[in-house]
Amino acid sequence: MISSLAAITGGPSTFRRDPDSNTLRLSRRKTLISVLRSCKNIAHVPSIHAKIIRTFHDQDAFVVFELIRVCSTLDSVDYAYDVFSYVSNPNVYLYTAMIDGFVSSGRSADGVSLYHRMIHNSVLPDNYVITSVLKACDLKVCREIHAQVLKLGFGSSRSVGLKMMEIYGKSGELVNAKKMFDEMPDRDHVAATVMINCYSECGFIKEALELFQDVKIKDTVCWTAMIDGLVRNKEMNKALELFREMQMENVSANEFTAVCVLSACSDLGALELGRWVHSFVENQRMELSNFVGNALINMYSRCGDINEARRVFRVMRDKDVISYNTMISGLAMHGASVEAINEFRDMVNRGFRPNQVTLVALLNACSHGGLLDIGLEVFNSMKRVFNVEPQIEHYGCIVDLLGRVGRLEEAYRFIENIPIEPDHIMLGTLLSACKIHGNMELGEKIAKRLFESENPDSGTYVLLSNLYASSGKWKESTEIRESMRDSGIEKEPGCSTIEVDNQIHEFLVGDIAHPHKEAIYQRLQELNRILRFKENQIDIIMGF
């Protein structure tokens, strides 16, 4: 397209003289940039581009910069690259615009390649282009650019330093990230937030909290980063405590904060707090985006309120694949298997392409509903219809489905014939089904395989012990328990949580660590006496 336009207007502008005055050129430049910025559709760009060429602005760095930016923003990065390629001797700003375009379009390799070409063409980089290319870098390229940064004297650039810290943190190079942080002259809340993320990425949540406490002025992003770090490191109670502290400090939360807190609520089953966050989102007039909506559906589903999950799903305007995946998973969790299948059909009819997560959710729905024929049909159509290669989770769903309907031998043959090695979860699922359906012989065979294949966990011992016990083989059941004890394997203690006044309290079996343990155990004894009294009253009434 560009070459044809150039032919119409007489070839590259490098060889043409613009007869207009500088004043007129500046006026046209301003107009063209304004028109480009107002462009909302790529279909309108070619006519504007033609005018740019006719008015000799196709080599004007200011106009070309805006043209590249607009094309990239409108998802036409190839058009943007054609524009860039037509420029004689592009400067560092045009390289920056084009690299940004590649990176924002997910073409990181092209962005890095163009940066290397810029260096090869002796165009001196600045901190802006370095920051842009760092967004596309892996650890290896980051180290190369870090060496260039030091050589070219950009080591003190704040934006470059923050971006390199982020890459080092995500790559597990915590020492390098900390070194860059320590060398920064201005370690304000922004730099601290990046370092908090680095600590969280690497699992050093204690260090992240210590740094967070040292930050004097914390903004919303800093609070959210710390809450997110706690959630990602499974410190859900601490995440909720920090959110409450954030509210007491009158720091405004945003949708990212809300999603982090909703994730913690989902994990802990904190329905009331989740409802409060939902009302907070509505009161703050936050948009019910996919990001927030999907988190709400997940929270309500996992906290037991599937009706509210349905309502949120219905009112969401722009659903995506994740929305459907979350809703289908929630329905499966609550035994609404037929409804889950209907949502899947609606998803496909609306043009959404199912992915691996979708099909795991759908197979789980079939499993929970005992829908064997539909489940097998879905599994057999994964590769053929949806071009999704079955993974171990999908095979595990079929084993669970066959086990639930009592077809244990068929499930075992299925495991024997799958192209991947079954894990302890898949084998444990079938062992559990053997206990339910009383198939001692197959249960022993699976247990033997579990003991031989890897270090068995407490669940394997407990399942086999219970299988023997349910069949009246008390001696064998006791021997398995003793073997478990002799191997030094301990069963994880039972755990329960209750939510009181938006606070989560966790209790373990035989727990004596709670600060109010004396009052708790006293109350439990009182409740036990009341229950025994009520039981005696019922016995008297029934005549026992």
From Swiss-Prot:
GO annotation terms (biological process): chloroplast RNA modification; chloroplast RNA processing; mRNA processing
PPR repeats: 60-90, 91-125, 127-156, 157-187, 188-218, 219-253, 254-288, 289-319, 320-354, 355-385, 391-421
FT transit peptide: 1-25
Region listing for Disordered, in residue ranges: 1-21
One Pfam assignment: PPR_2
Keywords linked to the UniProt accession: Chloroplast, mRNA processing, Plastid, Repeat, Transit peptide
Region (Type E(+) motif): 502-532
Record flagged with keyword Lipid biosynthesis: no
Primary location class: plastid
Residue stretches in coiled coil: none
GO CC term (a single one): chloroplast
Family in the record: Belongs to the PPR family. PCMP-E subfamily.
Functional note: Involved in RNA editing event in chloroplasts. Required for the editing of a single site in rpl23 transcript.
Protein name: Putative pentatricopeptide repeat-containing protein At5g59200, chloroplastic
Organism: Arabidopsis thaliana (Mouse-ear cress)
Gene: PCMP-E41
